[in-house]
A protein has these predicted regions:
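Oxyanion-binding/catalytic loops of NTP- or PPi-dependent enzymes
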Residues: 3, 7-60, 64-70, 79, ...
Length: 566
């Protein structure tokens, strides 16, 4: 979703002189739909019919019920895009049909697909989806052609992204990206709201948290206070008639200092540290390798945020670009290039963007293993194929399950989608050759196909917005991948032992059948006994209940069978 509307590389000045559009949609009681500043202004008196921060719900099954109709995130986002489209058409005096849309770098495949769907609903042909930090780097690179490595720190209203980008020789290459899709300026506002609620409860004995209208007024004042504290050390919050009681009307009149605000939000600022460190690590760089730190997003105006970046990176961040507008500026330049509207030979027309996929993609193989085909921070577009085979004898179909995440086992990752490949030629386990291909386009949208190389049969799936990873799940996946890595490795060894035991059991059964008339009676009896013992151990050790003791028993029995068969 976009918050600014641009034409060429010039900001589109809307009616009333505004340069940005709040992502707010409201429905009046007379069933009119309003978007942007007007929707935001009426929120206090119409809070239950006003929708904020829809970006956080993209790609989920969230629904908003208004007048008996359920609206999807795609539809609500489309209303915002329609408003931007109308503003651009008014500014240009001609129809607008194509657009480049920016999204948080950590948006999942489902969220990107949902964004494309919103564009379609709005009547726009989405030429390209660009990651917001990449778009900001494009805007920065236009006037800074020298080779350099840039860290883009993008803290917006609802999301946080950080990307490490290499700029040079007319190429803008994303080396790594990280982020938190549930951290932004809205969370800073909420801390002020909670503080005001607690202070009012202490002073007046009234809990405002259940009063929808009062809470909306608090949110509006909290946002104003946050902005004022970016340039002042104190601000006054005055809300007359915020509540009524038997004693009469109650008012809020509180002075909030920047120091108190910083204390209320210190943990939010600290949450940006780990994504920065992760991005640097994945890029193979240290903070001393970074030539420039670019602040993007209105929330980077918070002094404590800039101080943290300065402390973390050891250098003064750049303020050359307007943090509210640079993402849209980069998108406009890319749109001009894709639409062949840039002057030939200009710096903008020569620039090439190379972005990455934010999370690893895998399929489930025997034992619940997440077999990765594409690693996180792989440059897109990309295509990768790998040969797999069947796990059972005479198997005529396979289920392909696609996962996103960084853990070794699929149970700890997010299922994106699944499909079945039928018509596999009957054969012993391990004989069929099944080619699985992952294809990620320039928008970061995934297509997965599976082909039986023996029969030529093929099946594919494009991951849609019905399946997705939430913001919390992505952050949790990255965190757990590091915390539980040793635990995962240990369990992986148990899985390997079990799979080896199953393979040995199959080989022993096949050998017994093939040598029924050759082996002596005692050897056949011994092999049958060992097969029975190993089979029981395997059956008592399902994959989800493995432990060190069961793995050791299977390994010992498996080795005994191998020794007998030698």
């Amino acid at each position: 979703e976009i918050s600014e509307c641009l034409v060429g590389s010039e900001m589109c000045i809307r009616d009333r002189g505004y340069r940005t559009t709040p992502s707010v949609v409201a429905f009046t009681k007379s069933k009119e739909r309003i978007v942007g500043d007007a929707a935001k202004r009426q929120a206090a008196v119409n809070s239950d019919r006003t929708i904020f921060s829809i970006k956080r719900h993209m790609g989920t099954d969230y629904r908003k019920k208004i007048d008996g109709k359920y609206y999807t995130p795609q539809e609500i986002s489309a209303f915002i895009l329609m408003k931007l489209k109308e503003d651009a058409e008014d500014f240009l005096g001609q129809p607008v049909t194509d657009a480049v849309v920016t999204v948080p770098a950590y948006f999942t495949d489902a969220q990107r697909q949902a964004t494309k769907d919103a564009g379609k609903i709005a009547g726009l042909n989405i030429l390209r989806i660009i990651n917001e930090p990449t778009s900001a780097a494009l805007a920065y690179g236009l006037d800074n052609g020298m080779a350099q490595k840039v860290l883009v720190y993008d803290l917006g209203g609802g999301t946080f992204d950080v990307s490490v980008i290499d700029i040079g020789d007319n190429v803008i290459e994303v080396l790594a990206t990280s982020g938190d899709n549930h951290l932004g300026g809205d969370d800073f506002d909420e801390r002020i709201v909670n503080y005001l609620v607690e202070q009012f409860k202490l002073s007046d004995g009234i809990n405002l948290s259940k009063d929808v209208s009062a809470m909306q007024r608090l949110r509006e004042e909290a946002e104003k206070a946050k902005k004022e504290l970016s340039s002042s050390v104190t601000t006054n919050i005055n809300l007359p008639f915020i509540a009524m009681s038997k004693d009469g009307p109650h008012h809020i009149d509180i002075t909030l200092s920047r120091q108190t605000f910083d204390e209320l939000t210190a943990d939010l600022v600290d949450r940006t540290i780990t994504p920065v460190e992760n991005a640097l690590h994945d890029a193979g760089l240290s903070k001393t390798d970074i030539n420039m730190v670019l602040l993007v997003g209105g929330s980077t105006r918070i002094p404590a945020v800039a101080d943290k970046v300065r402390q973390l990176m050891g250098k003064e961040p750049s303020r050359n670009l307007n943090p509210d507008e640079c993402v849209a500026l980069g998108a406009a330049v890319q749109g001009g290039k894709l639409g062949n509207q840039l002057q030939a030979g200009s710096a903008a027309s020569e620039i090439i963007l190379m972005d990455v996929t934010p999370m690893s993609l895998s399929i489930e193989t025997m034992g619940g293993i997440a077999s990765r085909l594409i690693e996180r921070n792989t440059t897109i577009p990309t295509r990768h194929s790998q040969i797999f085979t069947t796990a059972g004898n005479f198997q005529t179909s396979v289920d392909i399950k696609v996962f996103q995440g960084e853990r070794k086992f699929t149970r700890d990752n997010k299922l994106l989608g699944n499909f079945r490949l039928n018509g596999i030629k009957r054969a012993m386990a391990g004989v069929p050759q099944i080619e699985v291909t992952f294809d990620i386009d320039v928008n970061g949208i995934v297509n997965v196909s599976a082909k039986d190389l023996g029969t030529g049969r093929e099946q594919s799936i494009t991951i849609t917005s019905s399946s997705n990873m939430t913001e919390e799940e992505i952050a949790k996946a990255r965190w757990e991948a590091e915390i539980y890595s040793k635990q995962d490795e240990a369990y992986q060894s148990f899985i390997d032992i079990r799979e080896d035991a199953v393979k040995t059991l199959n080989e022993a059964n096949n050998a017994l059948a093939a040598n029924k008339k050759v082996w002596e009676k005692d050897k056949k009896k011994n092999v049958k006994a060992q097969i029975g013992h190993l089979g029981k151990l395997i059956s008592k050790a399902p994959i989800d209940k493995l432990n060190e003791e069961k793995a050791a028993s299977m390994h010992e029995a498996s080795e005994a069978v191998k020794e007998t068969l030698r």
